[in-house]
Amino acid sequence: MHEWALADAIVRTVLDYAQREGAKRVKAVRVVLGELQDVAEDIVKFAMEQMFAGTIAEGAEIIFEEEEAVFKCRNCGHTWKLKEVKDRFDERIKEDIHFIPEVVHAFLACPKCGSHDFEVVQGRGVYVAGIMIEKEGEA
């Protein structure tokens, strides 16, 4: 269900933008999925296609990019990637982080100093990175 809510927000963003720009059709949408969120791309794509049906975005190409999750310790300055520590998470923890990414601080610590005081530098959210539209008179 979470993926459908994300897809709905993406679709609304795309259609609002297209309307503001006077588009006759949406040709493509580029969406960035943060690795930390662990979003099921296939479900988001299916949901977007269903919601685009009957709109100027029907048939638009949907392109996904995954943004690697990177963290930086506020205590010692060490930077690390999620893939370096992801094997420590069981399925329950992955699901908790999927719904509320901020809880990662409860389950993860800096691999260098052990501090839980770190920031998510990148790879946390989901966002629309690009929308390609066609206006009247354009081919």
Curated annotation (Swiss-Prot):
It holds the Pfam family HypA. Zn(2+) binds at C73, C76, C110, C113. PROSITE patterns: HYPA. GO terms for biological process: protein maturation; protein modification process. The keyword Nucleotidyltransferase does not apply. GO terms for molecular function: nickel cation binding; zinc ion binding. InterPro entries: Hydgase_Ni_incorp_HypA/HybF_CS, HypA/HybF. Ni(2+) binds at H2. Keywords: Metal-binding, Nickel, Zinc. Belongs to the HypA/HybF family. Involved in the maturation of [NiFe] hydrogenases. Required for nickel insertion into the metal center of the hydrogenase. PANTHER family: HYDROGENASE MATURATION FACTOR HYPA. This is Hydrogenase maturation factor HypA. It comes from Thermococcus gammatolerans (strain DSM 15229 / JCM 11827 / EJ3). The gene is hypA.
